[in-house]
Structures are given as structure tokens and as C-alpha cells.
Amino acid sequence: MANQLRETHQSLKKKYRELIDGESSLPPEKRNQVNLAQLLMDSRERNKQLAEEVKEVTQRLSETQGDNKLLRMTITKQRLGDDEVGIRHFPAHEREDLVRQLEKAALHREELEHTLKTLSDELQDVKAERTVFKEKSKRLNLELNHILGGQEKRIIDVDALCMENKYLHERLKQVQEEVSLLKSNIQKYKTALDRRKNPEIGGKSSSRSLTGVLSPKQVHGFLSEENGCSLPATPQSISDLKSLATALLETIHEKNIIIQHQRQTNRILGNRVADLERKLKTLEISGLWSLPDDRTGRGGPSLWERDTAGDDSFPNMWRGSRPGPDGGAGEEDTPVTREESDPSGTRTNGQVGTQLKEKKTACCPVTEVIAAVEELCVVLEAEDAVLALDPAGLQLQWTQTPSVTLEQSACKNTDIKNSAGSPATDLGEISEGAAVKIEPIEESGSSFVS
């Protein structure tokens, strides 16, 4: 056993010496490599030891910094005698920044306070003006109601009268334009009639073949392709063709003017309907009126109808006025009297003439106004549909009468409705009773007479 241990010791000693001194059998280069490997291992172990020392030193440094901070806080507490000063303690530069921020915040607060005070003063002024205007409006309504001889429960509203006045002003302007158009048409036809009665005014035109009144069939045959080639190229034919073309252009121009007047009247009536709808919406929102189906479920007359009910001994109400939700007058085209009224909102130049015949009383239900509004909406939709489907056909459509008068406007409602969706009218579709008066441009300045 001892021998074995001795041999093992000798072998290990030999190996250790070979590692330190290098093996004697190896060349010098190999010995240097073995020495470098040993040095590398030693350096790595040394680096590990140094890294552990660095970690330990870093930990000790952090502990020392914490101890210093705690010591400073303790010294500050002992000096100032405040236990919470450590929480609010800041360095000098941070304290300066905080002071500057506080100064800016104080200035901003002063500006906001000044602005708030100014706005409060303006609000008080606006409230005072609103009160003054309310009192003024109330006085005006009372004075107007007293002048018109109305009741105290049914005070006429100034706003409603202004709205009605605006509508009537637009209608008056429209009617004046239509009257001027009718006067020009009458003057033109009067001149043509005088020339027909006095053929010597036209000079040589009375002896020509195409002078006089021609039927639509004759005009169509004259302008047809078959007969067009057989027409002689003479000054007489050229003059007749120019006269016919001028008359047709004048007729088309008149139809265009009629359509423009119709669109303008539609716009006026549309604004009127919008005003009435806003009035009804105001009544519904204020709770003074409900729809005819009695959505409130109470039954019977509404609160507004009960408040405004009374004797009808005041026929001297303002024309077109109606009690509003605040006791004022709403918008209506008929006077509020006990007698049956028959207002006629007739629109000329091919437009619809609506006639509303209703018996109005002091507590007349609002359903009648709704019916009138619905009727106006249907009429406007029909007219817009006609214009959208075939505007060219409406411009070239020929009628028996050369112009539209106030009495004939109501009758043209049926013609306009029947013409929706129909193709454009050509010369072959001219009615039998119509006539065309042909006269040369040079001497007579002829026009198209239908």
C-alpha cells in the first residue's frame, strides 16, 4: 500500500515538473505553447477574482451613498425641526424652477379671473337686453291686438305677421312680373290683329301665297321633308321660312319664361310650407298641440285649444292670421271668421291653382292646416317630377291659348299632371284649332299666333 502511494506521488511529481519546466523530449516551441496556456488560465482566474471584488466595491458604494443621503436628511430634520421636510426637500436649482412656475401660474390665474369677470358682465348685459326685448315684444303684441280688436287670450304675434308679410311681398313681386309678361303678349297679339285687319299695312305681303293664318297641319306639311325639296328657292319662300322660324323661337322663349316663373313660384311656396312646418313643430315641441291620432292618450281638445276657445264676436281679425302657441297669430291663408271663406292661391303661367274651402272658427283644429300643407307638398312634388322627366317637352309644348291668364291657371293643373312622362311634342301633334300667322320679317315683323 505504501509502495503504491509512493509510486503515485512520484508520477504526479514528474507530471507537475513536466508542466512547469516542459517536457525534455519536446522542442522549445512546444514548451512555450504549454507555458502560454498556463498563463491564460491564471489570467482568467485573476479576472474572476477582480470581477467579484468590483461587485463588492459597487455594493459598498451604493450603501455608502444611501447612508450619506439618510445622514443629510437627519441633519436637515434636526436643524429645521420638521419631520416632513425630507419629503419636500429640493436642491437649489430645482427650487428656482418651481418658483418660476408658480409665478407663471399666478399670472395665468389672474388673467383667467379677469376674463371670467368680463364674461360675467357681458352675460348680465345680454340678460338685461333679452329682458328688454321680451317686454318690448309683449307690449307690441298687446298693442297690435288692441288695435286689431282681438281678444286677450288670442294675442296676435308680430313675428307671424312679419313672416306673412314677407310671403305676400314675394307673391306680389311674382304677380307683377307675370302681369308685365301678359301685357307684352297682349301688345304683340294686338299688333298682329291690327295687321290682319289692315292688310295694306303689310304692303306686298297680302298677295303672297303663304300669308294669312295657317293650320298646324299646313305648317307641318310645309316643313316636312317630302315637300321641303319641292319648295322653290325664291326670296318669298326664304322670307316665309324666316318668319315661321322667328315665330317659333318667340313661342319657345315664352314657354321658357313661363317655366322660370313656375320654378320661382314653387320656391316661394316651398319656403311658405317650410315656415308652416316649423310653426307646427314649435307647437308640437311646446306641448300645446299633438298629432290628430292623439298620441298623448288623453283625448279631447288640447290645452292650447281649450285656452284659446271663446266667442267668435271679433270678425275684425287680421287677414291670414291665426292664434299661435304663445297667444300670437300663426300663419294661415284664410281669415279667422265664422263665415265660410274661399281663398284661392292661384299660380299663373301653367302652375297649380290651389283652392282651400274650409270653415274656420276661433278654435279651428290644426288638422286643416296639415291637410293644406300635405296638398301643397303633393302639388310641388308633381311639378318637380314633370320638370325632371321632360323639361324639353314642356318648353316645346303647344297649347290653344298663347298666354296664361289668372283665370286659366287653375285649369292648367290638369294639363301639367297629364304631361308627366310624355315625350316631347313635335309639329305633328299640334292641335287642330291652333293657327300660325306667317308674315315676312322685312315688312310686317310677324309672330306665331296659336
UniProtKB/Swiss-Prot annotation:
Region Disordered, residue ranges: 290-358
Task: Identify the Pfam families for this entry.
Answer: CC149
The biased composition feature labelled Polar residues covers: 343-354
Native species: Danio rerio (Zebrafish)
Q: Does the keyword Coiled coil apply?
A: yes
- List each coiled-coil range: 1-197, 259-286
What protein name does the entry list? Coiled-coil domain-containing protein 149-A
Tree of life domain: Eukaryota
